[in-house]
Amino acid sequence: MIIDAHVHLYPPEIGRDPRGWAAAAGEPQWAALCTRIRRAGQPVQTFPTVEELLRAMDAAGVARAVLLGWYWEKLENCVAQNRFYAACVRAHPDRLAAFAALQPCAGHWPVLEEMHRARDGGLIGLGELSPHSQGYRVDDAVFAEVLTLAADWKMPVNLHVTDPAGRAYPGRVETPLADFGSLARTFPQTQFILAHWGGLLPLVDANANSATLPNVFYDTAASPLIYDSGIWPRALPLIGADRVLFGSDFPLNLYPKQDASPNMARFIAEARSGGADASVLGGNVARLLRLKSDAD
């Protein structure tokens, strides 16, 4: 069973006019990242409906997807996406699971109240969060409360990570790798998923391995835009296949030179060619999130 552990989806009002919505909603960083047009004239991503997502999954042989919230600058936009995700999961419980967006800058009570509402609505994790993009410190007191409660509730936390050696692009924010090792050590009961191969943290820090950071997993979101296909045989043995979660970053177009729109199947083929086995392609995230398999 293939599970895409890193998918974004947006309410219809965003998809109808992404740039206009971002301007009105106060989300300039999201606009820079998600509404940009590439030099060749292609949008960096599309804005599919939930039905279009399900059709794309069917075409690629993806059984389930984990919807990740965005690291919004405004809590009200987190709330709107969380309610939308709750509705998506209710409508398609056999195909979709979802994580909650949060903005700790909004303060103790608003954030914890939203976290409770999200859990009550069926959301099973937190993220994608980005302290460096959202404007709070990794040692922020509200963020610490969020991570502690996430551990109590067994809700994994997905964090956006940028490779310090990666290329520049509009909207890029630096995310010092040392911060993520520090978080994992400070909150050992919290399960962390570091997005985008975790900026290759285990490859640059000998102390960041599965033995020293047993609560850390890594997803592969946007991999073809960041690394060549050699990243799979290079990173899998060093990180450990049991710690890697296949994630695409759909609806980002990962192969703009070959495809006019997102192509999940091409990325799955790349992963398999690079050595991704059934655990990477779905088994690991199914166990982490306690998702039922086809055999259950």
Show where each model-derived region lies:
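Conserved, mostly hydrophobic/aromatic
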Residues: 6, 57, 85, 118, ...
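Active-site gating/metal-coordination segments in enzymes
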Residues: 63-165, 295
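A general structural detector for well-ordered alpha-helical segments in enzyme core domains, enriched
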Residues: 52-56, 81-88, 114-118, 142-146, ...
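Active-site environment of divalent metal-dependent phosphoester hydrolases
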Residues: 10-13, 72-75, 105-107, 133-134, ...
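Short, flexible/disordered intra-domain loops and linkers
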Residues: 42, 75-76, 166-174, 256-262
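Short aromatic-enriched loop/helix-cap "lid" or pocket-rim segments at secondary-structure transitions
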Residues: 13-19, 79, 111-112, 170-172, ...
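Mid-to-C-terminal alpha-helical segments outside catalytic/metal-binding sites
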Residues: 1-8, 12-59, 64, 234, ...
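Catalytic pocket-lining loop regions of alpha/beta-barrel enzymes
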Residues: 123-125, 135-245
